[in-house]
Amino acid sequence: MTAVEPATKKKRISKKNKSAWRKTDIQDVEQFLEDQRQEERVGTFADKQDEDLFVVDSSLPKTKATVLSVKQKRKLNAKKPMRSYQALENTSKVQDPIAKRNHVRQKKNGRNIELEVCNPTKPRHRQANSDRAQYYVKLEQRLADKKNKKLDVEKDIWQEVDFRDEIPGLKDEKGWISRELALHTAGNIGKKVVKTHASLHHKTTKAKKFELPHPGMSYNPAPEDHQALIDQVVEREEGIIKKEQHLKRVTTSMFSKVTPEERDRRRLNEMSQGMDEEEGSELDEDVQTNGKKKEDDDEKPYHTINAPVENKKKSKQARRNELKQKELARQTELKRKLKQQTADLIRIKSIRHELDDEEEDLNDLKKRRKQRAEKAKFEPKRLGRHKFEEPDLDVNLPEDIAGNLRNVKTESSLLKDRFHTLQRNNMLPTTKLVSRKKSKVKRFERNSHKEPGVSYNDLKERRRAAAAAAKATANIKI
């Protein structure tokens, strides 16, 4: 069978004369006859088997190229050998003439950890291997439990459960125990309903919630307690005064105070130092040099500013001497190092003592830093801009002690003390009193209110005197 070609519209040609018959298209007849002859030679399609006519396509179907992400590309590149090692690869096609090589392995210095693990010889190595094996067993068990963990699908997540039903005594029918009280009680008996972070239960300060005042602050204190309080206040004030004196010594006292006129005069003298002497000498030199300048210019030979450069090469003898000097310096340095080593061997005991002292100092420093860090845990934290400072102690002098509550002198405020306690316990940030800025308003008196011949300041003084007189009169009546 032949493939059927699609029919095409033939072009009509005039065949009126016999000579025009040669224009007739006989291509289809010739093609049919050629197909007949071909079938007679090789046979028709019906006579052949399917295996001769068709071929089974066993090739894999072509898939579209998948676009890899950056992470997948990074993983594929990690499996490839590094480019820095490509220079070490053998790219030659010539075979190695030496089929087998005897590699000489040098003995490594120090411990061979791999050998100690594989062939333990000491008890601590065996103990380490057993601990390592137990750790891996526990790790595999933990990973297996995590993999085989089943989710609790039987639990209804939308079901509302009251925690008071599980804890006896927290739910009553009359409603005396509220939900907030039950929640607080459950947390205190070890059955917390709301899980909180562990850091909330760590103590951050050693300060007490309510600290009793010093016994010397009593309205009728014992003489010893009152004296101890005074000593404590005096010691604190001495520290403050000492600090102020130090700051004054290193700042104000280091510089002398002068008036602006004196300062300008000193600066002028300093900047004009040596100018008067130079002016007189310069005039004399100019007169002398001007006459000799022309004569010197004629006598001096011409020369360039930069000296000519000569490329002088070292001789063999100079190079040999230079090498000898370098070798001599090297030998001298070796002798010095050998001498230093010999001296160190002689004083090895003193070096050992120095190392011990240095190690002891280092341990003391570590201990102090650890103590300082432990102490800083419980100090008042800086929760805001300002650092907490202990308030001043209230103290009465011996003549101010009343002895009874009726004549006691008020020194402090309970609200202030409580406020400082909250700041000390890291509950409130430390603040400072900020006064509101009072705007400076310039006042003018109207012309209609002015008295002739009296200024504004005089009127102000009169009003102030009148107010003081009225106040004095009111006090006398009382």
Curated annotation (Swiss-Prot):
UniProt feature, compositional bias: Acidic residues: 275-287
Compartments it resides in: Nucleus, Nucleolus; Nucleus, Nucleoplasm
A molecular function GO annotation: 5S rRNA binding
Main location: nucleus
Record keywords, A-Z: Nucleus, Ribosome biogenesis
Entry-linked Pfam families: Nop53
Biased composition (Basic residues): 100-110
Compositional bias segments (type: Basic and acidic residues): 259-269, 442-452
Region (Disordered): 90-110, 253-323, 440-459
GO cellular component assignments: nucleolus; nucleoplasm
The family this protein is said to belong to: Belongs to the NOP53 family.
Keyword Nucleus: yes
Purpose of the protein: May play a role in ribosome biogenesis, being required for integration of the 5S RNP into the ribosomal large subunit.
Signal sequence bounds: none
Superkingdom of the source species: Eukaryota
InterPro entries with a match to the protein in the record: Nop53/GLTSCR2 (IPR011687)
Lineage: Eukaryota, Metazoa, Ecdysozoa, Arthropoda, Hexapoda
Name of the protein in question: Ribosome biogenesis protein NOP53
GO BP annotations, alphabetical order: ribosomal large subunit assembly; rRNA processing
